[in-house]
């Protein structure tokens, strides 16, 4: 997931980011009308892995504290979607479903790779480099980047679910540092966690589902960057640098060549435009913070051996569509607001023969 760029400044103006908007688009499928679901960052990340709509806390990135939902809050059926969490909070009750919980229950593997997690274990809340998060109902010290550490909690949606963090050992084995391209992990690692480069070496070690969060410099969020060792010329240049390093490693891996799919998108753009019949959740009348309920048009590119290179898809999608598409591909039931979308990545995107 990348940060804070609307379609017009990226895919709509390839001179700004030629590797993403020209090279990768020519190799895959451009989703021209792909939208965020709110502002600021966190609610978009949460939506993509759980289908939960924005609430006032997640809309504000939970910067005031890593607060749990009140014990009195309940899940409800909301405008056609079941399992939507009521109330305001940051850390969702254990009963709230997630994509990775579904995957694990059906025998699939998953991993979330967080760049810079564990660089400063005390700050990140990751004593052994992995599963970094604040104490529940405590302050979040990892809101902004510091020298040498650009991990921020709000770009790691997995730690906002009790179903993940309450099993510390399981969380530490699944929510891990990205590592370097040579496979080196932070010095704080004491559990033998493996990063993306090492996991990509074989089909057997590559998770069925992976989620990658660059640090807040390389995802384009910050410019200039407190954690940046070699300054780039712009936020988009920093994004390009990250993609040029990691996309070839992913697409040349045995698992990707066999049957992989890589999605590259942004959390939110400018404005509050939306698609796909998105409606506000039960506790937030304006998740877009403006005249509409969404997070603006951001676009996305999909890469896969099963995609016709240079495909341009004009149908509308959003982060709930991504979740619904992944659930459909794995034969899983749809969670929360993923139940409300009609458009998914289907035969209109993939070639089947």
Can you say where each PLM-predicted feature lies in the sequence?
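N-terminal pro-sequences and low-complexity stem/linker regions of secreted or lumenal proteins
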Residues: 1-353
